[in-house]
Every structure is written in C-alpha cells, then in structure tokens.
Amino acid sequence: MAPKKKIVKKNKGDINEMTIIVEDSPLNKLNALNGLLEGGNGLSCISSELTDASYGPNLLEGLSKMRQENFLCDLVIGTKTKSFDVHKSVMASCSEYFYNILKKDPSIQRVDLNDISPLGLATVIAYAYTGKLTLSLYTIGSIISAAVYLQIHTLVKMCSDFLIREMSVENCMYVVNIAETYSLKNAKAAAQKFIRDNFLEFAESDQFMKLTFEQINELLIDDDLQLPSEIVAFQIAMKWLEFDQKRVKYAADLLSNIRFGTISAQDLVNYVQSVPRMMQDADCHRLLVDAMNYHLLPYHQNTLQSRRTRIRGGCRVLVTVGGRPGLTEKSLSRDILYRDPENGWSKLTEMPAKSFNQCVAVMDGFLYVAGGEDQNDARNQAKHAVSNFCRYDPRFNTWIHLASMNQKRTHFSLSVFNGLVYAAGGRNAEGSLASLECYVPSTNQWQPKTPLEVARCCHASAVADGRVLVTGGYIANAYSRSVCAYDPASDSWQELPNLSTPRGWHCAVTLSDRVYVMGGSQLGPRGERVDVLTVECYSPATGQWSYAAPLQVGVSTAGVSALHGRAYLVGGWNEGEKKYKKCIQCFSPELNEWTEDDELPEATVGVSCCTLSMPNNVTRESRASSVSSVPVSI
C-alpha cells in the first residue's frame, strides 16, 4: 500500500497574505488609462449636478399626450354635461382638492363636480397638464370659479393678476364683483384704488348708474376718493339718486357721506341749498344746516370737527412758518411754505403779519401761530415781542385772528394737549417770563395757569405721557439743564431729572412716546457761544434721560416737526460757522441716526416748523378760484 501524502495546513496569516486577482471591468480599465483610479494620484474627481431645461416641458407634453390618447388615465371628472379622463397623480399634484380626496381614498374612480362649468373645468385641466391657459374677461368667471373650488392657488393668482392688468373704467366694477365673490383681496384692493383715482371718469360711465346703494356708499365714505372738490361729490351723489326714484329712500344716508363742512358757505348757498331735496327732505336739510352753523361759529369749529369737516385725500406735509431769511438785514418773512412730496418746497400762503421767533402748533387740523417778534432788531429782540394769535385753515386757505395772549412773548414755547393750547415762559420788554396761559377754543379766551417756578426763556417743550415737558433754556442769565413737567389735570408743575448738557434756543419733539431734545447752544470754555451737538432722549416709562445719535450740523433757533415717525430739523443758526443754515436734518429713532434731507429754499433762522394735513393738488388748485386766500378777521 502506498503511503498517504501529508497535508500541510496553512495558517490564517498565510491566507491573508495571498493576492486575489480580480479582472478589471471595462469602466475601471478606462479610468485607469485616464489616471482616475480611486485613491490614486491621478486626475481629481468633482461631481456636478446638471439640469435638463427641457425635461419639465417634455414631461408635461408627454403627460398631455397620454391624456389625449386616454393612456393610463385612472380618474374621471364629471360635470352636468361633460366628463374628462385624467391622471390622478397630475390632478393631485396641482390641486389641494384632489390631493385631499385621493389621499382619503386612492381607489376612487370618478369625481362629479356639478357646480363647475365644463368650460372652467376644461381650462383648469389643460392648465394642470401644460401650465398654460388663455384668459379673457368673458371666460375668466368660469375659470376662476373652478380654480377656487379646486384650490389651485397658482391659477387663482394668475387670474387675479390678469384682472388687475386688464382694469379699465368699463370693467372695474366687474372686477370688484368677481374679487368680492371669490375673496381676491389683491384684485379688490386694486379695483377700489382704480375707482378712487378715476372716480370722475367712472361716474360718467354706464357702470356707475348700476351701482348698488352699498357700493356707492362705500365709495363716498372713502377718505382717499380723488375729486376736484366736495361739491363734485355732492353732484355725483345726486346724479345717482335721481337716476331711479326708488333710490330716494337712500338720500339722507348717502348724502351724510358728503363733507359739507369742507364746502365754503358761499358754495353751500349757490350749489347745495339750490337743490330742492336739500330743502324739502328734513334729514337732508339738517345736513345743510349743520354745515352752515359750522361756518357761522368759527370759534366752536374745534368741538364741531367730524368726518364731514375733514378733507378727502389729505396729505401730511412739512410746513415752515416765518423766520428771518438771509445773512443781511433782510425784512422778516410772512411766508408759509410746504414741502410737496413730489415737487419740493412751494409757497402755501402768507401770514397776516411778518413774524420772527414765533411759535406754532397744530390742533384739529388747524395751524395756530402765536407771539414772536414783528421787527428785526438783533440788539433787543424782547422789545419787539407781540401777543398776536391767529389760526390758519388749510381747507379754505384762510386766516382768522383769535384772542391775543395775555402777555407779549418771544422765545417761549407753545404746546397742544387735550384740545387746549398752552403758552409757557418766554420774554418781552419787561424781562423773562414765568407765566403759563391756556387758550380755550370754544370761548376764544386765554386763561392763566400755575406759573413756572422760575422765569425762563429760549427753552423748548413737548408733550408726553399726558404732561408738557419744558426743557433747558435761559434762566437767570445762564444756560440751564433743568427740566420740569406741567400736569394739566392738576394744574401743577413737577421737577424732572436734568439734561446732561445745558442748552438754549434748542428744539424738542415727541417720537413714539419719547421726547427728543436737540440743537441749541451753550457757553464754551472761553465764554463764547458754541453749538450743542448732543441729542438727549427722555423716556416717561423710566423717568430718565439717555443719549441719542448726535447732530451732524449744530443749529439754534431752528424748527422741528415729526412726520411719519421721524424728526425733521430745519434751518437755524450755526455758531461754528456764524452762518444761517438751509439744511434739513432727519432723525430716525429706529436706526438712531441722522441723515441730510433736502434743503429749504433759503437759509432761515427763527423759523417754525410743523406737520399739516393738506388737500391734494387737484383740490388746492380748484379751491383757489372759489375761495379767497386773503387773510380775514372774524
């Protein structure tokens, strides 16, 4: 017998060291030839995402072709007269309505939509498969109805945008009706604005006479309705009422939207009283009588203010009053300027008399101008202080002289609170004043109130937290840091924390319930006057002062007003340059920064500034021919 061969066992380590040869795939060979071996030192591999721009359109085209051939369609959508074969996945991908019902029951084979027109549904299905559609004012009603019902939001937006784009005088009410029916907020807002802006032309169209009472009532109540005058609004309302005798019952309610108080007494007689209905209908006649009484009682107009005395389409603008222009001994100014948002500064009117270092206030839509100086005498300004007090009405471009202040005042402050006007401190030929007096419009009288603890002038005041804050100024021949607050409810004064920097001839303004003190001058180390650039802010909530961004240009005897949440500091005298300034500096409390705005037409000191609601340009132009702009006294 032959001996058995001895089998030699290889250990585990020997097996691991064996080389296993695997034939390269064609791809690996190709990569190797180009040096693209993984982990090697060949060319680097960078992956990129590529997009086929034609893939989406091709996919839609393929799906649309499949639907036309009824290939793989798995859902039938029916209307009262017609059915459509579609793919569930396509309809569910663009319609929340189909997505929800198919998610509940994916096996559903048919959906009947009897409230949707075949035309509307066919257009929606075509849009789902192509992303395209043809719209017209004749078909959009059925299409948007289907799109809203099926919750296809992109299609609803396309329809809304189409309505806005195609807006005209002839179809604007049609757009309003569709927008209201299907809750298209953007389209409705656009249509309403279009009608407001083109109301005169719209009132001549056939669509206007078809308005319901609710629709014309909503238009005539609108503050932003663009009209040349309120007389035109009255005539348009009467035109609608007289078109159908059945509308007579709406006369008083509809005409209550006419701003009769903004029509002059002469025009009320000429154009309103001459209309028979205004004399025969008791409720309509009462509207006329109320307007007449409003004009006959000028001192009571503050308490008679209402929606019917407020101008339409008013625009809040910056207004400057008086001052001394130029670097020479030029006469004082009577001019009142306003800044049109589009056209810049223009002359609004003239004051009854020239004025310098006067104070202004706005209350109930009226501009009040008080005190100041009537002569240019730099050596003795207090000698020429006056007690004049007058009121400007921007609706009619007219002035009335009111009761003079009890004391002549210049370099004082004027504040408005709770329907009353407060004049504090200042100086005149007799010296600095501590007195405080309050103007009551209904009686046209000034009433003395508790005086300041010490006489002060060249200060600034602002209203916050129900109190009048009086800041800084000139006390006992020295610049002051002191601050005190007057409480009209208790007719008492309270000391508040001082300013960090003494100042006089400065400004104060309220922004977002905080008082900002800016500008003015103080004495430098050598006893010379220097500009104060620091700006301080008082918070009634904490009762403390803090710093805000400093001024870029120091100014004294400037004017300041708040507009759209910002402070505008205009004109003034710069001590560093010894120069009158025409700059307008704008402060944003949100950004805590100052920026240069446009300039005044002329460098001016002793100028006052306020914000006033003005009629729009069309109204201003039309009233000039019917209402005198010459100052009058009543």
UniProtKB/Swiss-Prot annotation:
Under SUPFAM superfamilies, the record lists:
Kelch motif (SSF117281), POZ domain (SSF54695)
Q: Which domain of life is it from?
A: Eukaryota
Q: Which InterPro entries match?
A: BACK (IPR011705), BTB-kelch_protein (IPR017096), BTB/POZ_dom (IPR000210), BTB_POZ_KLHL31 (IPR030604), Kelch-typ_b-propeller (IPR015915), Kelch_1 (IPR006652), SKP1/BTB/POZ_sf (IPR011333)
Q: Which residues carry this modification: N,N,N-trimethylalanine?
A: A2
Q: Where are the Kelch repeats?
A: 317-365, 366-419, 420-466, 468-513, 515-565, 567-614
Disulfides per UniProt: none
The BACK domain covers: 172-273
Q: Which GO terms describe its biological process?
A: negative regulation of JNK cascade; negative regulation of protein phosphorylation
Family matches, as Gene3D superfamilies: 1.25.40.420, Kelch-type beta propeller (2.120.10.80), Potassium Channel Kv1.1, Chain A (3.30.710.10)
Alphabetically ordered keywords of this record: Kelch repeat, Methylation, Repeat, Repressor, Transcription, Transcription regulation
Where do the BTB domain residues begin and end? 73-137
Among Pfam families, the record links this protein to: BACK, BTB, Kelch_1, Kelch_KLHDC2_KLHL20_DRC7
Q: Let me know which tissues express this protein, per UniProt.
A: Strongly expressed in skeletal muscle and weakly in heart. According to PubMed:15302408, not expressed in other tissues. According to PubMed:18719355, abundantly expressed in both embryonic skeletal and heart tissues.
Where is it found, in Gene Ontology cellular component terms? Answer: cytoplasm; nucleus
PTM summary: N-terminus is methylated by METTL11A/NTM1.
CDD domains membership: BACK_KLHL31_KBTBD1 (cd18470), BTB_POZ_KLHL31_KBTBD1 (cd18260)
Stated role: Transcriptional repressor in MAPK/JNK signaling pathway to regulate cellular functions. Overexpression inhibits the transcriptional activities of both the TPA-response element (TRE) and serum response element (SRE).
Write down what this protein is called: Kelch-like protein 31
This protein's species is Homo sapiens (Human)
List the lineage, top down.
Eukaryota, Metazoa, Chordata, Craniata, Vertebrata
- Per the record, the gene is KLHL31
